Amino acid sequence: MSQSPPPAQPAYVLHSRAYRETSALVDFLTPQGRLRAVLRSARGKAGTLARPFVPLEVEFRGKGELKNVGRMESVGNATWMVGEALFSGLYLNELLIRLLPAEDPHPAVFDHYAATLLALAEGRPLEPLLRSFEWRLLDDLGYGFSLNTDINDEPVAVDGLYRLQVDAGLERVYLLQPGLFNGTELLAMAEADWSAPGALSAAKRLMRQALAVHLGGRPLVSRELFRKP
């Protein structure tokens, strides 16, 4: 009795690079996590689909960590982005490659990624989208912390000053020092109130601090795109 092929699953290409003569080594984001697979005949029709931001349906074969692409089809229009929206999409992809463990299912991350791509393509403001994605990714990976309470379970005070103890939470401090956050900013972040003065810039600093320890010492290449003229 012949064995039926594995079911196809929704996927996005995070990164692709040449592999051997005519193949490509592709990192995919799926509801089942980040999967790496060999795409054969990458110079043909399949190769034109193996690019970021195209909603795909992919059949993966093989039980090892390195799989093979059995079938790959587009299931919608590619998300068209240019300029800083494109750089933002590439930033999301690099974050996922660096932070998401291989074959560790995170369906909520997949859904939020797809929704964020659509919002970027629609021209929505970039900073709130990026901060929301970073925060939810950290939370889904188990690295999240409360913005309403500190590490002693005390409510964040509007007039308080706080520093981030990575993987622990917010600690109230009483002496000025670099890298602090005020309570007003933190409470605005908790409500996603990006109209509050200083909330977006503080959220960017907070996410940088929270992500840094998990990214290691190697800088994100995609961040450099924003700095180029």
UniProtKB/Swiss-Prot annotation:
GO term, biological process aspect, one? double-strand break repair
**What Pfam families does this protein's entry cite?**
RecO_C, RecO_N
Q: Which residues form the signal peptide?
A: none
Q: Which UniProt keywords apply?
A: DNA damage, DNA recombination, DNA repair
Keyword presence, Secreted: no
GO CC annotation, single: bacterial nucleoid
- Origin: domain of life: Bacteria
Which InterPro entries did the record assign? ARFGAP/RecO, DNA_rep/recomb_RecO_N, NA-bd_OB-fold, RecO, RecO_C
Query: What's the family?
Result: Belongs to the RecO family.
Q: What does this protein do?
A: Involved in DNA repair and RecF pathway recombination.
What PANTHER family does the record point to?
DNA REPAIR PROTEIN RECO (PTHR33991:SF1)
- State the name under which the record lists this protein: DNA repair protein RecO
Which organism does this record belong to? Pseudomonas fluorescens (strain Pf0-1)
